[in-house]
Amino acid sequence: MANMVVTGEQLDKSIREVVRILEDAVGCTAGPKGLTVAISKPYGAPEVTKDGYKVMKSIKPEDPLALAIANIIAQSASQCNDKVGDGTTTCSILTAKVIEEVSKVKAAGADIICVREGVLKAKEAVLEALKCMKREVLSEEEIAQVATISANGDKNIGTKIAQCVKEVGKDGVITVEESKGFKELDVEKTDGMQFDRGYLSPYFVTNSEKMLVEFENPYILLTEKKLNIIQPLLPILENIARSGRPLLIIAEDVEGEALSTLVLNKLRGGLHVAAVKAPGFGDRRKDMLGDIAILTGAKHVINDELAIKMEDLTLCDLGTAKNIRITKDTTTIIGSVDNSCAHVQSRICQIRMQIDNSTSDYDKEKLQERLAKLSGGVAVLKVGGSSEVEVKERKDRVEDALHATRAAVEEGVVPGGGAALLYTLSALDNLKSKNDDEQLGINIVKRALQAPIKRIIKNAGSENAPCVIAHLLKQNDKELIFNVDVMNFANAFTSGVIDPLKVVRIAFDFAVSLAAVFMTLNAIVVDIPSKDDNSAAGGAGMGGMGGMGGF
């Protein structure tokens, strides 16, 4: 496929137009009084959402140049979303403002390299100022406030998320699922460990109506080995049968003679038994089996390295639990060893050290999951509603609120509603520049810092943003904010208008870094659509770019 190179004023104009259109679509969702956006689907009804990231990634211009620019911006938004799961809307508003201001000084003939240095210098000063403004999140009420703000003012969502954090702890797992019921939001708590492995045979089911395996006071046998033959298991199975208690086997796999014999004994009523595959793979499986052993009190995880063999196991070597619930997809161990016992706490400390020492985001995520299973259990937020559109829109807000809450617990909070960024202006007043063009870059960031609060106030139906900003800066009180819910000034922390520092920090960082990339972007190479393609863009000179008709 042939391609072409787009440079100069044509490229700059295209960047400005794409950024403006993206900001219009995404920016309208900002704040508690932000609007929704409908996203059409190839099949089914359009999806209605206030999730800025979802809106951003759904925009695919027909024009190849516009698409290339939009993809660069969407990639940065994706990285922002991956880091904190929120802040995409703020990132979009800031990016658009910086690029708009840069285009003005570029047209005036400023040295763009010096301007870029000024922008990046201002960025570092703002990030430091934000850190000095933070306050730790300690109470359940503060957690609820953060979640409520991120859920666009939905207090029910904020309260439920705070309830989840209280129940499973700051390291606990909280997940979001769609519910088939009409109840808007409900919390389901799992006390214990849950992993994504179900029963190996439906013949193990004890509750045929719900297709569940349900055991009370079972023994738990753990092994890293694959079980093919029944002979090594016979001694411990005989002891289990005499005890009258059920048995759960967690192994790499159970198949062949071993599986068929277990199923046969279960069907004949001689043994209450079930088998599941061990969670994870490779070394991670070994670690997770070790976690289960600690949590259930099992003395051994049978493997080739141990001196003790399967045939030598006694009932005292096995783990135990109050209850076990197994579906075709998950296994939940409930009421095992007390999470506060010394062995469990020692394991938790060990995993925390591994998280601190890990350099891989993927490894950290998996270690965090292990930590959560050991320390806090699992809480599930079940989102319901009267229609699929309603459920999906609410689920988006719940997920955003959950991400924001985690960020707030991790790094603390700052005044919300765009006020935190506004108050960092003072950090730029005394910032020294090498020359006039570098000062232009600093001034660009100053104007960009006012963009989020202006947009939030605009979305609330007011054009009074300049007066609001002037009043906030005049008071010299960095806890003062403008609450658009009541259209009046208030204290950020007493009114609950707060944002997670991590979300604000990363959104600003990514926005300015992305804008800096566009500052020095001199050319884009794009493919020319084939003649059979109905694309709006032609091959010669990108005709039709004016007004971005390709959107």
Swiss-Prot record:
Keywords of the record: ATP-binding, Chaperone, Cytoplasm, Isomerase, Nucleotide-binding
PROSITE patterns hit by this protein: CHAPERONINS_CPN60 (PS00296)
Any GO molecular function: ATP binding
Residues reported in the UniProt entry to bind ATP: 29-32, 50, 86-90, 417, 499
Reaction it catalyzes: ATP + H2O + a folded polypeptide = ADP + phosphate + an unfolded polypeptide
Assembly and binders: Forms a cylinder of 14 subunits composed of two heptameric rings stacked back-to-back. Interacts with the co-chaperonin GroES.
Protein's name according to its UniProt entry: Chaperonin GroEL
Organism: Ehrlichia ruminantium (strain Welgevonden)
Gene that encodes it: groEL
